[in-house]
């Protein structure tokens, strides 16, 4: 099953909203988790765990630090599921 960027973005937006209350429409591919969405490290780890559970993948800690934008996370998930 191939995942579209739009579907993964939609699910990441829902996960971010559930954890932080940020409006799903604000969660866009070019938005940085910390700089644009003001997500702290604890919330980011919860978001990562929820994404791992949803997609059945593991995101190593060193990779989490590389996921600066929502688009980075979407692309990582798509690549991990390919």
Swiss-Prot record:
Pathway: Lipid metabolism; fatty acid biosynthesis
Transmembrane segments: none
Modification sites for O-(pantetheine 4'-phosphoryl)serine: 41
Domain Carrier, first and last residues per copy: 3-81
One biological process term in Gene Ontology: lipid A biosynthetic process
UniProt entry keywords in alphabetical sequence: Cytoplasm, Fatty acid biosynthesis, Fatty acid metabolism, Lipid biosynthesis, Lipid metabolism, Phosphopantetheine, Phosphoprotein
Subcellular location as annotated: Cytoplasm
GO MF assignments: acyl binding; acyl carrier activity
Post-translational modification summary for this protein: 4'-phosphopantetheine is transferred from CoA to a specific serine of apo-ACP by AcpS. This modification is essential for activity because fatty acids are bound in thioester linkage to the sulfhydryl of the prosthetic group.
GO CC annotations on file: cytosol; membrane
One Pfam family here: PP-binding
Function: Carrier of the growing fatty acid chain in fatty acid biosynthesis.
Record-linked PANTHER family: ACYL CARRIER PROTEIN, CARRIER DOMAIN-CONTAINING PROTEIN
Family: Belongs to the acyl carrier protein (ACP) family.
Protein name per its UniProtKB record: Acyl carrier protein
Organism of this sequence: Tropheryma whipplei (strain Twist)
């Amino acid at each position: 099953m191939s995942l579209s960027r739009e579907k993964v973005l939609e699910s990441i937006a829902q996960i971010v909203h559930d954890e932080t209350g940020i409006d799903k429409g604000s969660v866009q591919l070019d938005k940085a988790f910390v700089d644009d969405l003001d997500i702290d490290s604890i919330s980011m780890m919860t978001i990562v765990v929820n994404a791992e559970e949803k997609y059945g993948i593991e995101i190593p800690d060193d990779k989490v630090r590389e996921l600066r934008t929502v688009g980075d996370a979407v692309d990582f998930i798509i690549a991990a599921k390919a």
